[in-house]
Amino acid sequence: MKRTFQPSVLKRNRSHGFRARMATKNGRQVLARRRAKGRSRLTVSK
């Protein structure tokens, strides 16, 4: 049986990376929330 999680760095960054977050208003809100919370990593991309 094929597993549901088939990792791809490219897809991961395009969906959840920093530039993807910055591209939309809501994405920027996500970053603002994570900054306010004090997250060491804001997004999955390095």
UniProtKB/Swiss-Prot annotation:
The lineage of its organism: Bacteria, Pseudomonadati, Pseudomonadota, Gammaproteobacteria, Enterobacterales. Belongs to the bacterial ribosomal protein bL34 family. This is Large ribosomal subunit protein bL34. GO terms for molecular function: structural constituent of ribosome. GO terms for biological process: translation. Keywords: Ribonucleoprotein, Ribosomal protein. It holds the Pfam family Ribosomal_L34. Residues 27-46 are annotated as: Disordered. It comes from the Bacteria. Residues 31-40 have a biased composition (Basic residues). One of its GO terms (cellular component) is ribosome. Disulfide bonds: none annotated.
